[in-house]
Structures are given as C-alpha cells and as structure tokens.
Amino acid sequence: DKAYSVGAVLVTRDGQVFTGYSRETAPDNHAEEEAILKAEQAGATLEGATIYSSMEPCSTRRSKPRSCSALIIDRRMKRVVFAVREPDRFVRCRGEQSLRDAGIEVCVLESLAKQALEANAHILSGPIVNPAAESSTRPDAADRRA
C-alpha cells in the first residue's frame, strides 16, 4: 500500500455524526471526502460543522478536482481538528494554512500524532522525498492519501 491511512469524523451543528476512512468506497477517496459524501447523502447541513481527521486535510490532488481542504471550505464548516500534519513525503501540504486563510478554526492535537503516524508506518519507513525537489505536479504526488 502506497497511500496514507486516514480516518475522519464529521459532526454537524445539530449533532449528526458521519465517519469516513481513506479508500472506503473508492480507491481515490480520502477520509474527509468519504465523511462529507455520507453527510450530504443523508441531507445533513454541513455549514458550521466540525470535522476531525487523523491527518491534515489535503490541499492538492491529482485524482480529483477539489482537495479535501477545498471541500471543507466550500461547505463553510466551522472547525477542523487533526492529529498530525501531512508529512512532506510526497507533496508539501498546505491544508492547514488554506483552512485558516478561509477563516476556519484549526486545532492540531499533537498528543495524538504518534498514533496517527504509527498507522502509516508502511509509508513513513521508506526513503523521504525531498519536498523542495518534488512538486505537487508530480503525477502521483497528490494521490498518496487516496
């Protein structure tokens, strides 16, 4: 497996809970995207919602037209909580910054980072790609959280 393992929980303002994990219903789907899709299929209002994720929401993707950060911003969610910033192994993620720039509250729970990273040891144990030498235009770079 050459993609991050990520889980997400979305909680609407009225307390509805939706979960998702990477590659749950399609090979290119991210965890946040899965939770958003379930919420929308249920007719939930996502404005003002909070989404919790084990990893920073992506800021760029090759496999889809919208990043998870963009999906969150588009739906006017209020808050994003995640355990670990996406490691600079494949692409330099700017999800946290794009969310903050859009006025979304961001909370990083660094106390849970170790567990989130352990779930991805299959990727993090290999050689590290130099993020300065790699760009988000690399054909497979933005799909590693798929």
What kind of feature is each model-predicted range?
Residues 1-2:
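Short, basic/aromatic recognition patches
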Residues 5-14:
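Short beta-strand scaffold segments in enzyme catalytic cores
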Residues 7, 58, 99:
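Residue-level signal for inorganic ion chemistry
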Residues 18-19:
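A structural microfeature
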Residues 22-40:
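Acidic helix/loop or adjacent segment enriched in Glu/Asp that either coordinates divalent metal
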Residues 25, 29, 51-73, 90:
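Local cysteine-cluster metal-coordination motifs and their immediate loop/turn environment
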Residues 44-49:
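Short helix-loop-beta connector
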Residues 63-146:
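Zinc-dependent deaminase
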